[in-house]
């Protein structure tokens, strides 16, 4: 199948497929006599794997490691688990950061009168981060 068909079936854009190929997450596509890329079912499985990994928030480097493990039939599942567990720890750290940001902003929203007066604690807080 050509790149357009592979894109449609994988849910990725042709640009992303070419990018994944350029950074070697996807093997170089075969070429037709006219030079068009040609993808097979194995490529579609790899693209689905990449897409799902990215949907779960894995970095491109992590996706590469996961692909290597996926393709290695002699892999130890402990290696996969360790990589996934590290990712969970990173997600938890990011969630904590976002929760703190949300709480701070919620507090500012609650203290803003939201009326016709120009006084606004949200803007004061934003301006206070500059030039100490």
From Swiss-Prot:
Keywords per UniProt: Cytoplasm, DNA-binding, Transcription, Transcription regulation
PROSITE patterns in the record: HTH_MERR_2
A Pfam family per the record: MerR-DNA-bind
DNA bind region: 4-23
Domain of life of the native organism: Bacteria
Subcellular localization(s) per the UniProt record: Cytoplasm
MF term (GO), any: DNA binding
InterPro entries named in the record: CueR, DNA-bd_dom_put_sf, MerR-type_HTH_dom, MerR_fam, Tscrpt_reg_MerR_DNA-bd
Record-level GO cellular component terms: cytoplasm
UniProt cross-references to CDD domains, sorted A to Z: HTH_CueR (cd01108)
Main localization category: cytoplasm
Residue stretches making up the HTH merR-type domain: 1-69
One annotated GO biological process: positive regulation of DNA-templated transcription
Domain notes: It contains a N-terminal DNA binding region and a C-terminal metal binding region.
Protein name from the UniProt record: Uncharacterized HTH-type transcriptional regulator PA4778
